[in-house]
Amino acid sequence: MMGGQNVTWRTLLTWIAGVSLGFSTAGYADDRWTQAGEVLLYALPLTAATATYTLEDPDGRSQLVMAYGVTMSTSYVLKGLVERERPDGTDDLSFPSLSAASAFTSAAFIQRRYGWDAGLPAYLAASYVGWSKVYSDRHHTTDVLAGAALAWGVSQWLVEPGSASQFAVVPTEGGMALAFEVNF
């Protein structure tokens, strides 16, 4: 694309959702509500990472990797220490929710780095991921809240605020889309 044309996230998010759908094959993802949560679980970090490349933000990319690494490592350590049984009884690795930690790391990064116009939809998507884990009996509500709080705290610590002007929430025929502008 040449000239001041916009690159919208609608195409990007459609691609990410399609790729992510392939990851939602877990045995417990047996209904559409849970499957949608699985799609968003993978789409959020892919979206955050893609934004750092598309917006040519190498500092943000490094901060995303650090925040994700610290959040997930801490979550794994806590799982081993707490050993809380899942609501469905499958194992004792319920606390904290890695899914919530992953989704909320992405959302917190997007909000902190690119502002609330991009962050609010990301937080809504992350909240849906958390809700879907409680709905599917994979986690207790407190597991999800702990994963979300950990992710938010680590992101506040490691992610520097960036320019918020590159993102916008725009109406579409089917609802809303997250968009950003890149000039070539």
What kind of feature is each model-predicted range?
Residues 51-71:
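Interfacial segments of alpha-helical transmembrane regions
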